[in-house]
Amino acid sequence: MESVLKSLFVLLVATSFTLAKEIPAKVSKPQTLSRGWGDNLEWVQTYEEGLYKAKAENKPLMLINHRNDCPHSLALKKAFAEHQGIQKLAEEFILLNVVYDPTDKNLQLDGQYVPKIIFVDPSLVVRADLPGKYSNHQYTYEPADIDHLFENMKKALVLLKTEL
């Protein structure tokens, strides 16, 4: 009886191994700092790091405030990532995208909303002179405004003041 049970056990184990299929692991892209806004661009992690690098490298900071669950943010992200001119010009900026509201009161400008894109000069002055097209949310952009954003990016590259 004991040998029959051992044989059944071995048969059961062998059958289990034979029938077992390897479940392929889900391949998912790691979350990068770009969050889909431009995977080939270099992004900083924090607002403070962005300010430091903007000043040190004498480049403007482009801050994108968005939400992962906001349809307007998602649509703008898609347009931003697909616009070749913006992707190329963005290489001239210190780039930061955040899914939270930065605590710097200078970035509040006309309220808290998303998506919002703000430029900060290397002299650490917020470029309030580079709004989007809307009076109620001055620093928001929609996919249809992507060329306006491109023009504002060009203007942001003209620095407010250069140090001697």
From Swiss-Prot:
Subcellular location, principal: secreted
Span of the annotated motif Homodimer stabilization: 34-43, 49-56
InterPro entries per record: AGR/TXD (IPR051099), Thioredoxin-like_sf (IPR036249)
Entry keyword set: Endoplasmic reticulum, Secreted, Signal
Record's subcellular location: Secreted; Endoplasmic reticulum
Signal sequence segment: 1-20
GO biological process: positive regulation of cell-substrate adhesion
Keyword Secreted: yes
Keyword Secreted assigned: yes
GO molecular function: dystroglycan binding; identical protein binding
GO cellular component: endoplasmic reticulum; extracellular region
Subunit and interaction comment: Monomer and homodimer.
UniProt similarity note: Belongs to the AGR family.
Protein name: Anterior gradient protein 2-B
Organism of provenance: Xenopus laevis
